[in-house]
Amino acid sequence: MHPSSRANGPAPHKPYNPFYLQLYFWVIIAIILGALLGHCYPAVGQQLKPLGDAFIKLVKMIISPVIFLTIVTGIASVAHVGTVARVFGKAMVYFLFFSTLALLLGLVVAHVVHPGAGMNINPVDLHQGEIANYVEKSHDLTLVGFLMDIIPKTLLSPFVGDNILQVLFVAVLFGIALALAGERGKPVLNLLDALTVPVFKLVQMLMKMAPIGAFGAIAFTIGKYGVDSLVNLGWLVGSFYLTSLLFVLVILGAVSWLCGFSILKLIRYLKAELLLVLGTSSSESALPSLMEKMVQAGCRKSVVGLVVPTGYSFNLDGTNIYMTLAALFIAQATNTELTPAHQLALFLVAMLSSKGAAGVSGAGFITLAATLAVVPEVPIAGMALILGVDRFMSECRSLTNFIGNAVATLVVSRWENALNHEQLKIALDGNEAAYQSLHAKDAEPSLSR
């Protein structure tokens, strides 16, 4: 390195680092202001729901192009179909193992804490009208239906819907076809490579609107449900948050340590995205940014393109913890005795139903209804108990799902020898000078490496 460049190395550090110019700072401010507005003026807060909905719709608008371009260019550049199958297989092994751990953890905590004990609720007295819609949707959840729904009606229909797995399916097939086309497919690959630049610029533009979306979403949540709704069921909510924290810091933390990185540094690296997920209660709102940041952290683009979108359907750690914990809470609150056989049935069905509801609005509640349906002894009407606080637990579900998918991407990348450890260290250590030097090469073209 030239002496002058070393001497001037720290110079660009300050212009990029003022906290008041960072996205996460303004998202925090928006969340605080939204919560205050929703608490002090509930009616006004509820009217701001369109702000949050509009932002999430804008992000969903760009998700399909991001996934398609990332996967197609990644697979086509690999040029080996066997590599794609190997990465997918490793990802599914990881997802199955940690989804099982999450379900078991929720089950164990429910037995240790007994969050519903002593409530002595009579299911007949519960108002079931509000949960009827969720129960009806749960009837449509079948494994065969879920698998068939992955196949789109036409090649273009995934881009006008909201099923991530359909986009993933088409992108993988198109990427493999492009790789098999060889030199004749190069012009198409170059075109798609060039398209990644404006698409990811658009992602950056949309992310600047995140504070507005977070403000509206939080104002609506607090305005409609109120902080008071947390008091009566605080033991359940607290148990869920602590269990999710335990899963992230202990289980995912141990996996991260074994793979050579810190879970706390990863959380710091993704702080802007995590705050966005917290504000919007939707992990999908940060999906494009997560894919971009994982590549910038040293993961190979083809691995990111396969693991992240697939993980959004198959690696829902927060949802899995919620389902077993909530199911046993309802059983305890209604004084329902569950035998080991009943609990095993709940566990097995939860493993399947959590995948079948991917991309469905109100997925957590719908999968819970589907899971409870296999054990008639547990009254589905008991779901009305947690309807008021489900929105507050939704944030924790989304955050845990998001962190779980970030860790999964790094672990599978390392497993596949597709992780640049030096680049990862620079990103997670927050070495601004080195990071800006790396980022100056233009993050979007780096996606096509």
From Swiss-Prot:
Q: Where does this polypeptide localize? A: Cell inner membrane
**Superkingdom of this protein's organism:** Bacteria
Keyword Transport appears in the UniProt entry: yes
Q: Name one GO molecular function term.
A: succinate transmembrane transporter activity
| Residues annotated as transmembrane | 18-38, 61-81, 93-113, 159-179, 202-222, 244-264, 311-331, 369-389
Q: Which GO terms describe its biological process?
A: L-aspartate transmembrane transport
Q: Name one GO cellular component term.
A: plasma membrane
Query: A Pfam family this protein belongs to?
Result: SDF
Broad class of where this protein is predominantly found: membrane
> Per UniProt, what is the membrane topology?
Multi-pass membrane protein
Q: Which keywords does the record carry? A: Cell inner membrane, Cell membrane, Membrane, Symport, Transmembrane, Transmembrane helix, Transport
InterPro entries membership: C4_dicarb_transport, Na-dicarboxylate_symporter, Na-dicarboxylate_symporter_CS, Na:dicarbo_symporter_sf
Q: Which HAMAP family match?
A: C4_dicarb_transport (MF_01300)
PANTHER family from the UniProt entry: AEROBIC C4-DICARBOXYLATE TRANSPORT PROTEIN (PTHR42865:SF1), PROTON/GLUTAMATE-ASPARTATE SYMPORTER (PTHR42865)
Q: What does this protein do?
A: Responsible for the transport of dicarboxylates such as succinate, fumarate, and malate from the periplasm across the membrane.
The text of the family note is: Belongs to the dicarboxylate/amino acid:cation symporter (DAACS) (TC 2.A.23) family.
Q: What is this protein called?
A: C4-dicarboxylate transport protein
What is the organism field in this record? Xylella fastidiosa (strain M12)
**Taxonomic path:** Bacteria, Pseudomonadati, Pseudomonadota, Gammaproteobacteria, Lysobacterales
